[in-house]
Amino acid sequence: MKVLSLFSGCGGMDLGLEGGFLAHRSSINSDLYASYISDHDENYVYLKKTGFETVFANDILPFAKLAWCNFFKNRVNQPENIFHLESIVDVVNNIENKQFSFPNDIDVVTGGFPCQDFSFAGKRKGFDSHKDHNGIIYNEPTEATRGQLYLWLKKVVEITKPKVFIAENVKGLVTLGDVKDIIQKDFRNIDDGYVVLDAQVLNAKNYGVAQNRERVIFIGISKRYANKKILDELISLQEKSEVYPYPPYTHGTDPELKPYATLNQILAHLPEPELASTDKSQQSYSKAKLFKKTQGNIEVNMNGQAPTIRAEHHGNIEFRRLSKENGGTNLSELHLPQRRLTVRECALIQSFPPDYEFVFNYGKANSVSASAAYKIIGNAVPPLLGFAIGRHLSQIWDKLFKT
């Protein structure tokens, strides 16, 4: 099944939908995922592929493309021909001007349209953002400014007519007036006709991610391709339907679920940065000083989940540990130097596999720095959240679209 990915970044959603990557054992509910896992080593299992394949990706960040292609080169031929380094506005304009065309027979369109203008951490300008798709600031908001780029995702859906589309954004969108309702209405008005269920806020920790990360997910299902009887049942029963597209929890406090993954579990096997002889991503971490009472200047709770990993500069990367003088509470690590989370630690917290290189060729052409890596990791959809969606969709696919 072919996936067209928009606002792809370093490919968290792409990788998740596809499967075929390593995940920490504490992050996987082996009872629910039994047919999708195979042993790898004492820390990791291998998640089998779901049947989805990314055939088009795009982003405006050069280092996002570098990281994406560097990882996906082991999964596809010529990944640089799949990933298009241009904005969604330029992509659509080039399609309409017949400069190039999308791949045929797209099954799924997915996109995490820019969230800065809807997030609690940002300025919450929403639809009134004056920054455009290439970062240029205008006097008045337009359809090409960040807060309205979901309309260009809508255009891509109208062009490609997939069976399913998935749109993702921050939880803050839900509390920003009637923004969620407006977006849902616009998605429901797509030319070819889609059933768009009420958007759901999913917390990544309920899917094995050792992080408290809430995201609002919109899912649309094509009326053209779906079985009418099954679709009518879905509309009527909503979450009680056997083809409800939002994935069930795998982790939580319910005794039938696996307990939430903790930072101690997913980070315990890592050496300290100075001892990480080959992994540049574990060697690299922000040296920014502690600034009390500002965002990101707290110590993570190793016995729980990390706060949301953000796509911001080094001074907002949480501390792996604080010193005793600065209020450090991680008793087993107080003898070690105070430091912030490494790039690798942030990546594992986001559930990226340990073989995904984020810092490479430093100081050379086509390099990705630690600063760039922090940014693309913080912008990403956690792969395990994407996998939960992809696995569940693959399981209900035939029933949804059988004729």
Swiss-Prot record:
It comes from the Bacteria. InterPro entries: C5-Methyltransferase (IPR050390), C5_DNA_meth_AS (IPR018117), C5_MeTfrase (IPR001525), C5_meth_CS (IPR031303), SAM-dependent_MTases_sf (IPR029063). Its EC number is 2.1.1.37. Keywords: DNA-binding, Methyltransferase, Restriction system, S-adenosyl-L-methionine, Transferase. It catalyses: a 2'-deoxycytidine in DNA + S-adenosyl-L-methionine = a 5-methyl-2'-deoxycytidine in DNA + S-adenosyl-L-homocysteine + H(+). It is an enzyme of class 2 (transferase). Disulfide bonds: none annotated. The keyword Methyltransferase applies. GO terms for biological process: DNA restriction-modification system; methylation; negative regulation of gene expression via chromosomal CpG island methylation. It holds the Pfam family DNA_methylase. Residues 1-400 form the SAM-dependent MTase C5-type domain. Belongs to the class I-like SAM-binding methyltransferase superfamily. C5-methyltransferase family. This is Type II methyltransferase M.BepI. It comes from Brevibacterium epidermidis. The gene is bepIM.
